[in-house]
Amino acid sequence: MNRFVATAFLACALPCSAQSASDGIAEYRAMLADGNPAELWQAKGELLWKQSRGPKQASLERCDLGRGPGVVKGAFVELPRFFADTGRVQDLESRLLTCMQELQGFDAVAIAKTPFGKGEMLNIESLVAYVSGESSGMKFNVSQAHPEEKAMYEAGEKIFYFRGGPYDFSCASCHGQEGKRIRLQDLPDLTTNKGAGAGFGSWPAYRVSSGQLWGMQRRLNDCFRQQRFPSPGYVSDVTLALETYLGVNAKGAESIAPALKR
């Protein structure tokens, strides 16, 4: 009888404890939200957007993020999208690389090979914070009008469910079902509109644990690392396809980027 009572107590206490910890994390984030350090990256990003840089000594103020040259507000929530000038579906980071190469003369290939948090990659993270912040509070509306956009979504869905690696993991292993947690942190179900809105809609973000701002490309590459897969690479078709899948699933959700993460 005593063993039964103890087991019943633990069965009740553990979910309550996990929920209490989850609530505590949410409260902690809310306390920090008003002073999100990502604002420092946003401020730097705005300066970089307007500053003449690179071999061509030009600014990014003529960069077309999808709404016309120089238009920043509202662009982030419509990415990834197809761009006729490159013939590719591009996300924000991929498009920034294109503009940095075409307008400023930087070597996009060399930058893409730079480790996260180093060199020009630091500047891209600041630009990402600035551009995403200009669409904060707006709703995601990632297009599926072009055949290439549809193909990217379909590829992203397949990649999301692909299982492999030493752990036989897929993205769906952690993010394909409601109610999952890791280290007492809730994991959003990215196959649903609500979950994709909470997950996709909160990147880029300042990570308290690393003291750095992470873009979605860095987040996705780290997910592959955690699965023990080879790195897909910066702005690869794999990561762009996943972003398209998540972005379409998040249609109508409000962007809170740049957000705050543990």
Give names to the regions the model predicted:
Residues A30-L47, M138-E157:
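Short, charged low-complexity linear segments at domain edges
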Residues A6-P15:
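Bacterial N-terminal signal peptides
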Residues Q19-L40, K50-S126, G133-G137, F162-R262:
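Electron-transfer interface patches adjacent to heme c in soluble/periplasmic c-type cytochromes
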Residues M1-F4:
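Positively charged n-region of N-terminal signal peptides that target proteins for export
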